[in-house]
Amino acid sequence: MAEDWLDCPALGPGWKRREVFRKSGATCGRSDTYYQSPTGDRIRSKVELTRYLGPACDLTLFDFKQGILCYPAPKAHPVAVASKKRKKPSRPAKTRKRQVGPQSGEVRKEAPRDETKADTDTAPASFPAPGCCENCGISFSGDGTQRQRLKTLCKDCRAQRIAFNREQRMFKRVGCGECAACQVTEDCGACSTCLLQLPHDVASGLFCKCERRRCLRIVERSRGCGVCRGCQTQEDCGHCPICLRPPRPGLRRQWKCVQRRCLRGKHARRKGGCDSKMAARRRPGAQPLPPPPPSQSPEPTEPHPRALAPSPPAEFIYYCVDEDELQPYTNRRQNRKCGACAACLRRMDCGRCDFCCDKPKFGGSNQKRQKCRWRQCLQFAMKRLLPSVWSESEDGAGSPPPYRRRKRPSSARRHHLGPTLKPTLATRTAQPDHTQAPTKQEAGGGFVLPPPGTDLVFLREGASSPVQVPGPVAASTEALLQEAQCSGLSWVVALPQVKQEKADTQDEWTPGTAVLTSPVLVPGCPSKAVDPGLPSVKQEPPDPEEDKEENKDDSASKLAPEEEAGGAGTPVITEIFSLGGTRFRDTAVWLPRSKDLKKPGARKQ
């Protein structure tokens, strides 16, 4: 067939079809059929054609490949097979053929037709197939060609069922146009269909309408057996979650009362989601009992335990998928939202709660897998998911609280003392409540101050001499901490009663002891005034050998002033244990001085 548009009168005037052959690929030689409507829309499958024409046009007999209507021949194949088995011993047809052997082919063709007619006439008389209509209850003789999954209906009832189904499909897609729901022209914006923004186009095949605009003539199929107590109950109980649920204006209730639901066949259709407790409640020997009063709480024997005692609205799980979903909890997904509260109408995530920080789009590990706390439904969500539970310590829940990160465990913090400190040291002030607690104070990101009772030596690179600050004498005395801020440096000086072995001053010393009346100054760092109420500090004169070393250090520091003002000017904290009042010159082995300090060129390399 040529690849041009040809008229297709089977679909009506203006319809055209075209057959295109494939010229390459694994399916080379096969053809594809396309149809074009009078409005210019192109259709390439029978499914699209059915959606386009709607339920008014029946395409059961339409051959999409050829573009014609194919009327099936009468099917009598099963009856003919039965007649052959029945006519084997007598074989009257073959004797007739032998008698009329040398005749024309027309007579040979007429013989099987006469045989089949005789078989169809004798089959109902010899093997009647009576049946009972499931709808009206009358008995009729069936032909035995129907499939087992279809209901046994007489011809009149089957025709009524087909017409009813066709009408219901039209009501679901288009509507009747007469009821109050069909007269509504605007969506409510609160139902699940409006919130999910599902397509309303009929050609899409979804036909998702707003719940307020759904035709009232749509009849939902009753999935009950009609025999059990739930199917025979005609009135609502008034105390189940469905009956207690507040109605939404303009919307009708789509779920049955729990007491009116069928008790048979519900769990047999489920593929999973059944645990041992529910299996024990559905034992065949258990008989349904009337619901006990609210004061008593025995274990229910019915398969619907939630029907006996109503649950509060906050703990009620709202389902908007199917009628069967309002059963005891299974492992299937549920949707807990009303669609009308402020949380359900919120579109954006806060980005600061723990659920948002867990999402991959905010850099989380996707472990909790919950939506934003500020978008949890205020009516149907579980209480543990609401933001009020998460931010109880906050003053108010008006805005999303900041995200609190978990602190690292103390075992993972292993700090080692190095030869130099980082440029910035963040020290924590000691609280007076924890005087007896043990204790290592953190200094910056990777250093630890020693516990009380030990001596500290602060070395200033390039300075004239170090300053030694021993710990307090008694554990009960509280050390007053005072910050001394330098350029890019913050360190701690303890100011209890101190014995200083050596001070960096250029004055001449006299033998004996001297009492300082001015605060101790460290070169290169501004110091704060010392409390005048503190006790006096004893000092001893330096040795001449140490003065020579100090002069060398001063000359080395003058060669590189820029380096001393930068990162090289950071102090070195070294722990000296159990000095016990020893002179500082005797402990020179504890403080080895690096050669890099004396040679500024080595540091630059």
UniProtKB/Swiss-Prot annotation:
Residue ranges annotated as compositionally biased, kind Basic and acidic residues, are 106-120
Residues the record lists as Phosphoserine modifications = 297, 391, 399
GO CC terms on record? chromosome; intracellular membrane-bounded organelle; nuclear matrix; nuclear speck; nucleoplasm; nucleus
List ligand-binding residues for Zn(2+) 2.
188, 191, 194, 210
What changing residue 34 to A/F does, per the record, is: Strongly reduces binding to methylated DNA
Basic residues compositional bias, start-end: 83-99, 403-417
* Residues that coordinate or bind Zn(2+) 4: 237, 240, 243, 257
Q: Where does Zn(2+) 6 bind?
A: 350, 353, 356, 372
Q: Does the entry feature the keyword ATP-binding, yes or no?
A: no
The annotated regions of Pro residues compositional bias extend over 287-297
Cross-linked sites for Glycyl lysine isopeptide (Lys-Gly) (interchain with G-Cter in SUMO2): 117, 277, 422, 440, 499, 538, 558
Q: Where does Zn(2+) 3 bind?
A: 225, 228, 231, 262
Posttranslational modification: Sumoylated, sumoylation may increase interaction with ATF7IP.
What is the tissue specificity? Widely expressed.
Please provide the Gene Ontology terms (biological process) for this protein: DNA methylation-dependent constitutive heterochromatin formation; negative regulation of DNA-templated transcription; negative regulation of transcription by RNA polymerase II; transcription by RNA polymerase II
Which residues does the UniProt record annotate as the domain MBD? 1-69
Disordered: annotated span: 80-123, 269-308, 391-451, 520-573
Induction, per UniProt: Up-regulated by interferon.
Effect upon mutating residue 45 to A: Reduces binding to methylated DNA
Q: Where on this chain is Nuclear localization signal (motif)? A: 84-88
- What does the comment on domains in this protein's record state? The methyl-CpG-binding domain (MBD) functions both in binding to methylated DNA and in protein interactions.
Q: What does this protein do?
A: Transcriptional repressor that binds CpG islands in promoters where the DNA is methylated at position 5 of cytosine within CpG dinucleotides. Binding is abolished by the presence of 7-mG that is produced by DNA damage by methylmethanesulfonate (MMS). Acts as transcriptional repressor and plays a role in gene silencing by recruiting ATF7IP, which in turn recruits factors such as the histone methyltransferase SETDB1. Probably forms a complex with SETDB1 and ATF7IP that represses transcription and couples DNA methylation and histone 'Lys-9' trimethylation.
The subunit field of the Swiss-Prot or TrEMBL record says: Interacts with OASL, ATF7IP, ATF7IP2 and BAHD1. Binds CHAF1A and the SUV39H1-CBX5 complex via the MBD domain. Binds MGP via the TRD domain. May be part of the MeCP1 complex.
The protein, known as: Methyl-CpG-binding domain protein 1
Query: What organism is the protein native to?
Result: Homo sapiens
